[in-house]
Amino acid sequence: MKYIKDNLEKINASISDDVVLVAVSKTKPIADLQEAYDAGQRVFGENKIQEMVAKYDALPKDIQWHMIGHLQSNKVKYMAHFVDLIHGVDSFKTLKEINKQAKKHDRIISCLLQVRIAKEETKFGLPYEEISTILHAEELKNLTNINIAGFMGMATFTSEETVLDEEFSLLKAFFDQNQPQHPNLKILSMGMSGDYKIGIRNGSTMIRVGSSIFGARNYIT
């Protein structure tokens, strides 16, 4: 499976050191993740908590685990003891649950608020004005076991670069607008296998790449 190592080297050579590469390992067998780990990859993203827990138990403990899928509040408790970053937070209710579970483990869990930047109706996330409401909410000050570390956006599924540039650049402008008042905002997660170069061009500091590392998806049962 040398192709995994080769793919990682190729991607890392194309991005700067200040961009974090999240290897999206959902549906991939543990052997593939171990191969990526042996090639130096330490940040992995999963979209199902049960699968992430199983991989956490089986793999080295210096891995950083990111939850990148849409999060159900009632599942937070299963990963609160180890998850490093939760990407897809799009409700205050979920923030409160993450805070509650983090407190039980005496941890502060970092989260990214998911902004709805795509034109497609199927995408999760909140419109810009609702993100602003959360950031300025008085109640947020009481959630001392979470850290809102930045924003995540999924662009429209299209090959039209002008559309992607517009969506990503708007999110970057929103990030820049809010960062002075909220200095904990440090991460801008924009870009996946098909559009990460455009994301980086527009200021992304974190990319989520799966198929370009591991190949086509393998559904594991």
What are the residue ranges of the model-derived segments?
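Conserved alpha/beta-domain cores
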Residues: 1-173, 177-194, 200-202
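Expand to "…catalyze enediolate/carbanion chemistry for C-C bond making/breaking, isomerization
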Residues: 197-201, 209, 213-216, 220-221
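Conserved, well-ordered active-site substructure
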Residues: 206
